[in-house]
Amino acid sequence: MFIDKVNTYLAAGRGGDGCISFRREKYVPYGGPDGGNGGNGGDIYFESDQHKTTLLDLSYRPKFKAEDGQKGSSGDKSGRYGEDLIIKIPLGTLIFKNGEFFADLKTVGERILIVKGGRGGRGNASFKTGRHTVPRIAEKGAPGETAEVNLELRLIADVGLLGLPNAGKSTLLSQISAAKPKIADYPFTTLAPNLGVVNYKGKHFTAADIPGIIEGAYKGIGLGFEFLRHIRRTKVLIHVIDVNGFDGRDPYENYKIINNELKKYSKHLAKKHVIIVLNKIDSAVSLEQIKNFKKHLKVKKLFETSAATGYGIDALLKEMLRMLEKPVAFSTEGEVEPLHVKKYIYEPEFKISIENGIFVATGAKVETLTEVTKFNEDESLRRYRNILKKMGLEIELKKMGARPGDTVRIGDFEFTFEK
């Protein structure tokens, strides 16, 4: 089954908690704190794989979760880092993260970080100072990043075969490559793109057979529209035309239909290198139709083939190689720039709003501090309050009208405001 669009949820691993421990050994007085740090949570990456041609395996997984980091331990031992999760996806996959275009994997083995694992919490050995020699403080591991991810596959093929239904595209692909697409004598036999690798005179290239396009495809009519995006990146287009016509129209009328659909869908597609192939020449019912087609077409080269018998295939392959050797200027039409370059934008340490009588403080710094603080440890709680005070949260709450006894919320933690 060919799947070219998938939505999934990614959750990086949480960091391991830091440890509170003190060195206790005979003959070692004042051993001091030796609680180790927690390990970082695992990251999640996408990596392009040339052997994958569909997103089918991802469609069965609505959620991916990386491994959490392990807790720190005594002896100043850090916890093990969570294992990174690497998800293989086909070449040419567009990645949309939280509704915005994030990356486009165009090269084999390209790997990109999507969500980062949480930082491991610090153990009490990390809080030792000259003045504070016996800290009873440790942090919880920070949660990993999460993201809603949409994947959209755009096949990367050197040659794209297109045309009206039943023009013989699948048969032609099976002649020039080892691909074995479904072939039958009725329209819309091909319901999804087929990829094949062509090996001709020591040269290799890929070819894709696109499902039949019908009139009005640019408006979303028929099957072909769903797959037109797959030929945006092809270097050469092979326009396959049934010599006997289709749907009661002669070959030239059918040729014009496909050309018009390409122009309406994308001006860039209409400007690509195109090889015109008049197929099923062995079953031509009228030589007059062939002459009429050539008369109206007015192109320097027209290839007459029979994909069923192999007639004209060798000449067509030579032309494909010749066209592929020409330089191609790829258009950026329909493409957008990735957003995975991090932008640094100044944000205040916190903002305060009032919701249903509760003072709500938001901001990356105060929320992260809240997430990693162990509130069941008295010393950790005192440290938490001192940091918030130094940040100016208490003064700002008073300015907003907070009084003793009012509720303050930061993240999932609520506490009572005191003077």
Swiss-Prot record:
Domain (OCT) ranges: 342-419
Enzyme class per UniProt: hydrolase
InterPro entries: G_OBG (IPR031167), GTP-bd (IPR006073), GTP-bd_Obg/CgtA (IPR014100), GTP-bd_prot_GTP1/OBG_C_sf (IPR036346), GTP1-OBG_CS (IPR006074), GTP1_OBG_dom (IPR006169), GTP1_OBG_dom_sf (IPR036726), OBG_GTPase (IPR045086)
Location of the OBG-type G domain: 157-325
Organism domain of life: Bacteria
Database matches in PROSITE patterns: G_OBG (PS51710), GTP1_OBG (PS00905), OBG (PS51883), OCT (PS51881)
Claim: Magnesium is one of the keywords in the record: yes
UniProt keyword list: Cytoplasm, GTP-binding, Hydrolase, Magnesium, Metal-binding, Nucleotide-binding
An example molecular function term from Gene Ontology annotations: GTPase activity
List of residues binding GTP: 163-170, 188-192, 209-212, 279-282, 306-308
Positions contributing to Mg(2+) binding: S170, T190
Recorded GO CC terms: cytoplasm
GO terms, biological process: ribosome biogenesis
EC code: 3.6.5.-
Localisation: Cytoplasm
Major subcellular location class: cytoplasm
Ranges for domain Obg: 1-156
Keyword Transmembrane helix: no
Signal peptide: none
Needed cofactors: Mg(2+)
Family the UniProt entry places it in: Belongs to the TRAFAC class OBG-HflX-like GTPase superfamily. OBG GTPase family.
Biological role stated in the UniProt entry: An essential GTPase which binds GTP, GDP and possibly (p)ppGpp with moderate affinity, with high nucleotide exchange rates and a fairly low GTP hydrolysis rate. Plays a role in control of the cell cycle, stress response, ribosome biogenesis and in those bacteria that undergo differentiation, in morphogenesis control.
Complex formation: Monomer.
Protein name, entry field: GTPase Obg
Organism of this sequence: Endomicrobium trichonymphae
